[in-house]
Amino acid sequence: MMVLRQRRAAALFLFAFIFLMPVSHAHSREKADIKTLVIVSHPYPERSVLTKGLQEAAESLEGVTVRNLETLYGYDTRRINGDAERKMMRENRRVVFIFPTHWFNITPMMKAWLNETWGSVGPGLWQGKEMFVVSTAAGGSSTYGPDGRIGVSLADVFLPMKASALHAGMTWLPPLVFESASSDRLPSYQHQLIERLKQ
């Protein structure tokens, strides 16, 4: 009888170990596969819905450091600390830029960040790192693409970013761009961003 009880106890312990232990980790944060620096900018933060939502998605992952330029520096481009930002660049293998397309360009603060942080970057200084652009745009097919008003794709708008990445020796990753962006589709945008950051 004692042996039978011991066997039952051992079986229950084994069952609990195999089937219940993983449940205790079910709510742990997902993790980015590569140590990642995310630079976020929006020219009108108080109106930001999509950019804010994408920032929150990035912040949900371990291994990701998020820096919102307007939160850190306001709108004063002279306050950007190039030394501190370069240190952050050196500590991460991938840099992600999240912003709304602003007059077919990046935001003013993001351009100032690049000027201050990369202003003295010579060819190949960020060798081995990756650049990933994430952007939203109000315009859709009537604006972008071969039949659109400007005749180029939204991804083409970011060619200066691609040139900067390649000049610095970085790998240019395919951008994640959302045309005709809508707050109704924010959960989908967040999911897509998280999946890309986990790669």
Label each PLM-derived region with a short phrase.
Residues 35-42, 134-135:
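Short beta-strand segments enriched in small/hydrophobic residues
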Residues 74-83, 184-189:
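Structural motif
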Residues 61-78:
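A short beta-strand-loop structural module common to alpha/beta enzyme folds
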Residues 11-22:
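Bacterial N-terminal signal peptides
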Residues 2-11:
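Bacterial N-terminal signal peptides that target proteins for export
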Residues 30-37, 55-61, 160-199:
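Glycine-rich phosphate/pyrophosphate-binding loop and the adjoining helix
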Residues 26-28:
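Boundary at the C-terminal end of the N-terminal hydrophobic targeting segment
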Residues 81-162:
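Helix-loop-strand module that forms the ligand-binding subsite of alpha/beta enzymes
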